[in-house]
Amino acid sequence: MKLSVFAVLLAAKPFDEACKYLANAGVQAVEIGCGGFPGKAHCDPKEFLAHPEKIDEMLATLKKYNLEIAALSTHGNCVHPNPEVARQFEEDYENTILLAEKMGVDTVVNSAFAITPHLFHCGF
């Protein structure tokens, strides 16, 4: 078993600084947010897919701090009643899956949070 943290908890910090903090705290793996309600502070999958060097930079940072990727995640509501909002969530999810494939990550997490949208300040 490995201790993992959802990196969006440190979204205000640059990814390198967040990884350093987590490694010093004994964390061994990270779940990286890639869109949806928590945002894309450390990883915008569309941007990473368009610029593969960003993938290399992220993987190098993780290696530097001896961290693994537990999962990529995008917590959005792909069945949102507003079609434009739903489409953005779908795009984030699709790009996250494609990015996971490129990065060799075998776990992608998606959760709509439809029951508790107030936790992420979204207006349904």
Show where each model-derived region lies.
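Glycine-enriched alpha-helix->loop->beta-strand junction motifs that scaffold or abut catalytic
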Residues: 25-29, 104
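Conserved beta-strand positions in the central sheet of alpha/beta enzyme cores
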Residues: 31, 71-73, 109
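Extreme N-terminal starter segment of soluble prokaryotic enzymes
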Residues: 1-5
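Active-site acidic/histidine proton-transfer and metal-coordination neighborhood
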Residues: 16-17, 21, 56-57, 61-65, ...
